[in-house]
Amino acid sequence: MKNVTDSFVSLVHWPSAGSFGFNTDILATNPINLSVVLGVLIFFGKGVLSDLLDNRKQRILNTIRNSEELREGAIEQLEKARARLQDVQIEAEGYRAYGYFGIDEQRHESINSTYKTLEQLENNKNESIHFEQQRAINQVRQQIFQQALQGALGTLNSCLNNELHLRTISANIGLFGSMKELTD
């Protein structure tokens, strides 16, 4: 341990001529170097510090503005809440003056109105279901009719050949000829 301490002490007291060592004497350091370093720090640091302070000032001002706006909004909401409270208190006084009979009557009216509304909704639902069923039935009928018609046309087209077609035309001409003779 003593060797480590001795080596550190000898390093501190190392002769300054031609060698490197720690200079613990602050008065012996070069004042010009210190003043240059401090001058550079002050010159460049002043701008950075000024920008930091300006940014901080703007953030504080914005925070204050936002706080003022929030405070005004809160005051406005508080006034609305107070007005609503007064309205509710007046309404409550009216209910107290009207008595429980009026409240019970209003409750029955509300229940009856709700039942009527539900009944109307049920009727509307049933009508909608019936309408949709009829529409679906009509669509199915149309599709069946179209398929039957297409099937009949397909069958006729596949069964008719030129010879059968000519015989049918000749038979119809003969039928029309005999009908003409009867009418004359």
Swiss-Prot record:
Statement: the UniProt record of this protein carries the keyword Amino-acid biosynthesis: no
Top-level taxon of origin: Eukaryota
Record's subcellular location: Plastid, Chloroplast thylakoid membrane
Entry keyword Transmembrane: yes
Keywords from the named record: ATP synthesis, ATP-binding, CF(0), Chloroplast, Hydrogen ion transport, Ion transport, Membrane, Nucleotide-binding, Plastid, Thylakoid, Transmembrane, Transmembrane helix, Transport
A Gene Ontology term for the protein's cellular component: proton-transporting ATP synthase complex
Transmembrane portions of the chain: 27-49
Membrane topology: Single-pass membrane protein
Molecular functions per Gene Ontology: ATP binding; proton-transporting ATP synthase activity, rotational mechanism
Comment field (misc): In plastids the F-type ATPase is also known as CF(1)CF(0).
Quaternary structure and partners: F-type ATPases have 2 components, F(1) - the catalytic core - and F(0) - the membrane proton channel. F(1) has five subunits: alpha(3), beta(3), gamma(1), delta(1), epsilon(1). F(0) has four main subunits: a(1), b(1), b'(1) and c(10-14). The alpha and beta chains form an alternating ring which encloses part of the gamma chain. F(1) is attached to F(0) by a central stalk formed by the gamma and epsilon chains, while a peripheral stalk is formed by the delta, b and b' chains.
Function: F(1)F(0) ATP synthase produces ATP from ADP in the presence of a proton or sodium gradient. F-type ATPases consist of two structural domains, F(1) containing the extramembraneous catalytic core and F(0) containing the membrane proton channel, linked together by a central stalk and a peripheral stalk. During catalysis, ATP synthesis in the catalytic domain of F(1) is coupled via a rotary mechanism of the central stalk subunits to proton translocation. Component of the F(0) channel, it forms part of the peripheral stalk, linking F(1) to F(0).
Entry's family note: Belongs to the ATPase B chain family.
Name used for this protein in its record: ATP synthase subunit b, chloroplastic
